[in-house]
UniProtKB/Swiss-Prot annotation:
Name of the protein this chain belongs to: Photosystem I assembly protein Ycf4
Keyword Thylakoid (UniProt): yes
Lineage: Bacteria, Bacillati, Cyanobacteriota, Cyanophyceae, Synechococcales
Keywords assigned: Membrane, Photosynthesis, Thylakoid, Transmembrane, Transmembrane helix
Subcellular location: Cellular thylakoid membrane
Keyword Transmembrane helix: yes
An annotated GO BP: photosynthesis
Family, similarity comment: Belongs to the Ycf4 family.
């Protein structure tokens, strides 16, 4: 790439936390299914406890419904991880005079192109508390701020400042919010 192009990858849903949650839901769902089947068949299919001693109606049946709910949730989580929803890139091309923000969606990619002349500033937003928000956004003339950072776990403050300053320097615009 030339010095007139800056490309930033954006992490999507392929994060360790999502893998751990999807794995836990899958294992829990299989456990509930085995407990439900154990109560129906009258044989212990799970090495822990004695689920065969459970009465199938209502306890075994409810565990079967829990396993169905877990299977649906796990399918959704593994699909989101496989597609890498939210992943993509931010591409700033001075030669073409355009900012291209691309993300992977559920069904189709999301592509936003903004002329560089419409970018007024780079905004660094820091809000601490229960619902913390740390993000870098583009302040665009005539539009709402366009977020550039990943969704989920907040970035460290030093990394946020570094990314914002680097982008503002590259684009030749002001850095706001610090």
């Amino acid at each position: 790439m030339s010095a007139a192009v800056l490309e930033q990858p954006v992490l999507g849903s392929r994060r360790l936390s999502n893998f751990l949650v999807a794995s836990a839901v899958t294992i829990g769902g299989v456990g509930f299914l085995l407990a439900s089947l154990s109560s129906y068949l009258g044989r212990d299919l799970v090495p822990i406890g004695h689920p065969a001693a459970l009465v199938f109606v209502p306890q075994g049946l409810v565990m079967g419904l829990y396993s169905l709910a877990a299977a649906l949730l796990a399918t959704y989580l593994w699909y989101v991880i496989a597609v890498n929803v939210g992943g993509g890139s931010n591409r700033f091309d001075k030669d073409a005079g355009v900012v291209t923000i691309s993300r992977r969606g559920f069904r189709k990619p999301v592509l936003v192109e903004i002329p560089l002349k419409d970018v007024k500033a780079v905004k660094v937003e820091v809000r601490d508390g229960f619902n913390a928000r740390r993000r870098v956004a583009l302040r665009i003339q005539g539009r709402r701020d366009m977020p550039l950072t990943r969704v989920g776990e907040p970035l460290p403050l030093a990394q946020l400042e570094k990314d914002g300053a680097e982008l503002a320097r590259f684009l030749g615009v002001n850095l706001e919010g610090l």
